[in-house]
Amino acid sequence: MNPRRKKRLTLAVALIGGVAAIASLLLYALNSNLNLFYTPSEIVNGKTDTGVKPEAGQRIRVGGMVTVGSMVRDPNSLHVQFAVHDSLGGEILVTYDDLLPDLFREGQGIVAQGVLGEDGKLAATEVLAKHDENYMPPEVAEAMGQKHEKLDYSQQKSATQ
């Protein structure tokens, strides 16, 4: 192999190696910032289609309804703990160390983003409350709508009369 061809080959291999290293670092950075959405049932039982459960230490988003009577506030700090449930019966505890949104209340739909702990609790870094009676995050609406059955009040009322 002549020196010119050897130099080109070395340059090509170095260029391909550099591109591969940059792509690897980029994918690693994207993977660590990836937030997957789960319902409480999916955290407890795994995703319905794949059975995959989130791992401890993973950043996730959880959506559902705040369980009535589950909120516990620390009187000496901003620390609050509450449970979030969904229509499938799954429930997860969420801890949060900041001011809750003004519209946050028990029985309200929320989305919490944070890190799943070894104990199964979500250490939330952000809590979003729904802002009016018609709004629900698309992921929560889809998950809750799978088991939601619409009632026809006109038929129900005529049956009782």
From Swiss-Prot:
Provenance organism: Shewanella oneidensis (strain ATCC 700550 / JCM 31522 / CIP 106686 / LMG 19005 / NCIMB 14063 / MR-1)
Gene Ontology biological process terms in this record: cytochrome complex assembly
Cytoplasmic side: 1-8
Keyword Aminoacyl-tRNA synthetase annotated: no
UniProt key word Transmembrane: yes
Family under the similarity heading: Belongs to the CcmE/CycJ family.
PANTHER family per UniProt: CYTOCHROME C-TYPE BIOGENESIS PROTEIN CCME HOMOLOG, MITOCHONDRIAL (PTHR34128:SF2)
HAMAP family according to UniProt: CcmE
This protein's UniProt keywords: Cell inner membrane, Cell membrane, Cytochrome c-type biogenesis, Heme, Iron, Membrane, Metal-binding, Signal-anchor, Transmembrane, Transmembrane helix
Membrane topology: Single-pass type II membrane protein
Chain segments carrying region Disordered: 138-161
Any one GO MF annotation of this record: metal ion binding
Descriptive protein name: Cytochrome c-type biogenesis protein CcmE
Bilayer-spanning residue ranges: 9-29
Periplasmic-side segments: 30-161
Higher taxonomy: Bacteria, Pseudomonadati, Pseudomonadota, Gammaproteobacteria, Alteromonadales
Compartment annotation: Cell inner membrane
Ligand binding (heme): H131, Y135
